[in-house]
Design a protein with these regions (language model features):
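Flexible "arm" and connector segments at domain edges
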Residues: 1-62, 66-107
Length: 107
C-alpha cells in the first residue's frame, strides 16, 4: 500500500495539488463528498438494482473514497496499510453486542 500512496502523491505533485489541497481537513471533506456520491448510486434502489445499473460508477466512487482515505493517512505521515491492520486488530479484541453479531436480515 506504500507504493499506492506514493503513486497518489506523485499524481498530486504532477498537477501541483500536493501543497495546495493535501490537508487533512480538506481531504476529510472531500472523502465525505465522494462517499455521498457513492450513496447516490444506491438512492431509491435495491442493492440488486443499484449494482446492476451502476456497478462501474459504484466502483469508481469506491476508488475515490479509498484514494482520499490514503491521502489523509499520507498527509498525517501514516501508512494506510499499517492503520488498517491496527484497526482490524483492535476490532478483533472488541466485544460486540449479540444484536450485531447476528445479521438483522436472518430470521
Amino acid at each position: 500500500m506504500k507504493q499506492l500512496q506514493a503513486e497518489i502523491t506523485a499524481f498530486l505533485k504532477e498537477r501541483d495539488w500536493l501543497d495546495q489541497y493535501n490537508h487533512p481537513k480538506d481531504l476529510a471533506i472531500s472523502l465525505s463528498l465522494e462517499a455521498a456520491e457513492l450513496l447516490e448510486c444506491f438512492q431509491w434502489k435495491t442493492d440488486e438494482i443499484a449494482l446492476k445499473e451502476n456497478r462501474e460508477e459504484l466502483l469508481k466512487e469506491v476508488a475515490d473514497v479509498l484514494i482520499y482515505a490514503l491521502q489523509i493517512a499520507e498527509s498525517m505521515g501514516a501508512d494506510g496499510e499499517e492503520l488498517v491492520r491496527m484497526k482490524l486488530a483492535e476490532n478483533r479484541r472488541r466485544t460486540w453486542p449479540k444484536k450485531i453479531k447476528k445479521s438483522c436480515f436472518t430470521k
